[in-house]
UniProtKB/Swiss-Prot annotation:
Subunit structure: Heterotetramer of two alpha chains (FadB) and two beta chains (FadA).
Gene3D superfamilies according to UniProt: 3.40.47.10
Protein's UniProt name: 3-ketoacyl-CoA thiolase
Physiological role: Catalyzes the final step of fatty acid oxidation in which acetyl-CoA is released and the CoA ester of a fatty acid two carbons shorter is formed.
High-level lineage: Bacteria, Pseudomonadati, Pseudomonadota, Gammaproteobacteria, Aeromonadales
Positions annotated as active site in the UniProt record: 91 (acyl-thioester intermediate), 343 (proton acceptor), 373 (proton acceptor)
Places the protein is found: Cytoplasm
Amino acid sequence: MKDVVIVDCIRTPMGRSKGGAFRNVRAEDLSAHLMKSILLRNPNLDPNEIEDIYWGCVQQTLEQGFNIARNAALLAGIPKQVGAVTVNRLCGSSMQALHDASRAIQVGDGDIFIIGGVEHMGHVPMSHGVDFHPGMAKSVAKASGMMGLTAEMLGKLHGISRQQQDEFAARSHRRAHAATVEGRFAKEIVGLEGHDASGARFFYDYDEVIRPETTVETLSQLRPVFDPVNGTVTAGTSSALSDGAAAMLVMSADRAKALGLTPRAKIRAMAVAGCDAAIMGYGPVPATQKALKRAGLTIGDIDLFELNEAFAAQSLPCVKDLGLQDVVDEKVNLNGGAIALGHPLGCSGARISTTLLNLMEEKDATLGVATMCIGLGQGIATVFERV
């Protein structure tokens, strides 16, 4: 099989979904901006050589409907003969897009792909039009479709306290703010125009979602939001609602070499796994274990991890059962995570992978894992190796 390499990876700033920077910017525009930008950053690449575009998006309706991948590609001026398809594995959609492109390259069905994803949660809410089949209640707990309650369940099963959740969430904001101030996100963010609070046009090249003032003390004052009587999960310990997109240029190693493009990493292994929908946030554990087995690696071999922070109550059990609790500050989400940056559903897989690759370069790390939970009980993971 052909080796699959990542040549480039970028993302938009993360905008707040409620009246945020991108309230007047459509999801197709966020996507097209990155498609154009990744080509501008790699002038050796002839766009006519692109085989296909795989683009993750969860809520495929309204402006995100009718194959947003193709709509964005047309807006971006991608040659008309290049295909584009929208991919949906809920929270893992853009990582699934990466996996799909990687497999196509491995079996010889193309050498050059753009992958990524988008979600404008301000324009298309997560629950818009959702209508679960009532018969699912025969085999799946009714609350399984309510992500916050699945986090409550997972946290209770693993004895995760409110204090632990508040500390983890404060850490996310603290580290994300430090990464912003120190310019560590500059290599991955491709800024674009939005609107400030007054409605004036403003060029955003930073994440609007981060709240640097967040502390354990302020978080401790928030009430549980999903289970007000007995719960511990608050809005502050949940991933923020945000708008954003991320993209990667994925190629066969041979074609990258022929074009004189320097790979940043290669795909070492990929995996998805299922788990009980009632504890959907546990998915990263079996997915990561499966990916590592395929790569012939152990947890101890991995230098850095990016674990999508859907909830603190969900992340901490995964950290514990992956055996990472003693190395969190050395290996896990060193630039914060979705609690601070937000979790635009279709974007997040490519976003955490992009952040991971930049951290691996910064830390001169060799091996990294990006993994995330997926609604209704799945996990997805990718093992990257720097080249």
